[in-house]
């Protein structure tokens, strides 16, 4: 059985397991030269596909190691990779402090800062702004669907082969 494991959060990475043995594992930051790379590990996955001559024909499962996908800002914008210390401090005061204290907060704060300061960054998961207002369960379902579509397209693999697992138990 051939399984490609993918972690698309902070320190994103991909690994290859053949018949239960890990043959290769690589973090995206090794290929992009950006510490704490976040998001889908495009270059790491491409490396595995090319190096081991993998395709839809011989891959059994693509194991995505994050189940909970409701925080749009978290999945859409690789802020851990590109934000400066000052960006993070501003975000704590302008976004997280009011949000966590139950006050009004700017839902599009991270999007606005990210798109203004980092317009060259590629965003793989195309999540509509309207999803911010969806109930959690519906948002989870829709973001998971967007993830499956994006992963299927970038890897040229059947959607039915893409599965989600709790990253704490992988």
Say what each PLM segment does.
Residues 1-170:
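Short acidic/glycine-rich loops and adjacent helix/strand connectors
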